[in-house]
Amino acid sequence: MHCAQYTAGRCRSCQWLDKPYPQQLADKQHHLESLLAGHAVTQWLAPVFGRESAFRNKAKMVVSGSVERPLLGMLHRDGTPVDLCACPLYPPSFEPVFTVLKTFIARAGLTPYNVARKRGELKFLLLTESTYNGELMLRFVLRSETKLAQLIAALPWLQQQLPQLAVISANIQPVHMAILEGEREIPLTEQQALPERFNQVPLYIRPQSFFQTNPQVAASLYATARQWVQEHEVHSMWDLFCGVGGFGLHCAGPETQLTGIEINAEAIACARQSAEQLGLKNVSFAALDSTRFATAEAQIPELVLVNPPRRGIGRELCDYLSQMAPKFILYSSCNAETMAKDISLLAGYHIERVQLFDMFPHTSHYEVLTLLTLRR
């Protein structure tokens, strides 16, 4: 993959861009195998990968420059702006959208935030595309509500230029820190959920809910989880740290007793919407802390699926699972190092199979799916 900004030394987000892609996969697989070297693994499956470019469904753009000539991209270490509108990780559909958005910023008078001077209003633009129908979700991250009325007044022009804009919102982030978004989200369109579909399973993305940024590989990850669960004829399961419910909704059959737990209420609203659309009657989702929920339960299902943030599931949940001993633990991780530490704490379990999913080409990061079975 060629990137002009990488070649010029202005962007190093893709740290491994100089490394041939087959070597990237081999290095990631070696890293994963070394982390689990102390455990017996029954089956290592070949890594799953997708496109090497144009695979991202989301852009996080720092807004800089002036209101008349805004720049979208990132800030270099020395504070100079780097234009990322032509980033090869984005689909071709994004660049013309960015062109319109630059014009809109000028029309609406949305002054870009200046980090050095701590002045201005528009900090970020967050753009997400649905691979299901091509609709877009756009979030304006503002320092305050000062320019909100101007933004709303100018929206009809933007919606006319970009009819695929289905979900628009403003996020208020008043803190002068490298924090992407604040707690307050202001909806600017009636529709506030972007429809997506993986493997015939309807999913929804709301402004403040997490969603995988590589749809092609994410669809393979969910399909693989479903296959592994179905092979063991599981009738009851938990989906902890469930997000919008992607794993649980793929794995649950009409008779499966599924409980999905996620701290983010927006994500839970998405999961419930999907479950209702699928007609699943034995499925429930709740906006709770996953560890607190689990450790308060006196009974355990046959399978516990966990998809934690980078910190892993931690000792408290590992101790609980070891004590309660579900037949299966399906662990999906975006940080194999914390997953390996957690597995070492899960007494009484054997690693049945492991598979790497390269969600993040040209970087050292990857996702991994691991099936643990209780030793008989």
UniProtKB/Swiss-Prot annotation:
Key words of the record: 4Fe-4S, Iron, Iron-sulfur, Metal-binding, Methyltransferase, rRNA processing, S-adenosyl-L-methionine, Transferase
Active site location: C334
Biological-process GO terms, alphabetical: rRNA base methylation
Keyword Membrane appears in the UniProt entry: no
Binding site for [4Fe-4S] cluster: C3, C11, C14, C87
The family this protein is said to belong to: Belongs to the class I-like SAM-binding methyltransferase superfamily. RNA M5U methyltransferase family. RlmC subfamily.
Function: Catalyzes the formation of 5-methyl-uridine at position 747 (m5U747) in 23S rRNA.
The name this protein goes by in its record: 23S rRNA (uracil(747)-C(5))-methyltransferase RlmC
Protein's organism: Yersinia pestis
Lineage: Bacteria, Pseudomonadati, Pseudomonadota, Gammaproteobacteria, Enterobacterales
